[in-house]
Amino acid sequence: MAHIFVYGTLKRGQPNHKVMLDHSHGLAAFRGRGCTVESFPLVIAGEHNIPWLLYLPGKGHCVTGEIYEVDEQMLRFLDDFEDCPSMYQRTALQVQVLEWEGDGDPGDSVQCFVYTTATYAPEWLFLPYHESYDSEGPHGLRYNPRENR
């Protein structure tokens, strides 16, 4: 089992969360909420308003999201779902626990896989950086789900 940290459309209440609940993809168990220990730019970009965590450690904000424990089957599914390694790259990062279910305490640090990208348009660096993502957020950039494209 591995920990993954999701910050965008895979979070609870977001457009793609349903794939985390589909056991045909493997197992994913919610473990808590956290934030990246290092700062990163979280931007919303492209014609479909996709959230992207740019792999630029030290720039942007500590990003909040959710921590899941996943099995190997779900990890492989998510790699495919996130078009890894072409669109996103699966990166191991330290995540500080904000709220935890079960063993563990707030303030602890957990190593998680996170889908980041090092391949992006240069103008993305000038987009607003977000601390957290909500498809319905005040940014007004509603995500366009895959099934609508």
Swiss-Prot record:
In this chain, substrate is annotated as bound at: 7-10
What are the EC numbers? Answer: 4.3.2.8
Keyword terms of this UniProt record? Lyase
Q: Which GO terms describe its biological process?
A: modified amino acid catabolic process
- Keyword Oxidoreductase carried by entry: no
An example Gene Ontology molecular-function term: gamma-glutamylaminecyclotransferase activity
Pfam family for this entry, one: GGACT
Q: Which domain of life is it from?
A: Eukaryota
**Partners and quaternary state?**
Monomer.
What functional role does this protein have?
Contributes to degradation of proteins cross-linked by transglutaminases by degrading the cross-link between a lysine and a glutamic acid residue. Catalyzes the formation of 5-oxo-L-proline from L-gamma-glutamyl-L-epsilon-lysine. Inactive with L-gamma-glutamyl-alpha-amino acid substrates such as L-gamma-glutamyl-L-alpha-cysteine and L-gamma-glutamyl-L-alpha-alanine.
Q: What is this protein called?
A: Gamma-glutamylaminecyclotransferase
Q: Which gene encodes it?
A: Ggact
